[in-house]
Amino acid sequence: MHNEEIEPILLESKTIAVVGISDKLGRPSLTVSSYLKDHGYEVFPVNPNLSSVAHTPCYPDLKSLPVTPDLVVIFRKASDVPDVVREAVATAVPKIWIQEGIVSEEAYRMAEIAGMAVVMDKCILKEHARLVREGRIKKGHD
């Protein structure tokens, strides 16, 4: 995915599910989740092993969310990503972001075939911060 294709994904998304979130300080999933909340996104933590993260209810899976999120950000090992994408397809999520360092060609193809916008092996925090620096996205995500 090219940089110009990333901007609309971030601008059009208001609700974001973070799959594989950790409640441990310093973990990338928690840092990214906090950053996204601080920039105006409504974030839904997803991890079947946690009941809450940073005073926010945590959901066991995508189908348990109270809304269909605009975007799912995945922090899972590559072998788990296809199952997350299958669930996202089943719940009609329109956009998938497979976080930096995670590569699953199977999941990427699956998302594309389902008509989803998909980003893989890029950090959503870094990409958002770059667009803020460039003045292309407002800091508060209006």
Kindly give the residue locations of the regions a language model identified.
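NAD(P)-binding Rossmann-fold cofactor-contacting core
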Residues: 22-27, 34-54
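A short helix->loop->beta-strand "cap" motif at the edges of active sites that frequently abuts
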Residues: 39-41, 91-96, 114-116
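Conserved beta-strand elements of the Class I
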Residues: 17-19
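A charged, well-structured terminal subsegment
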Residues: 127-142
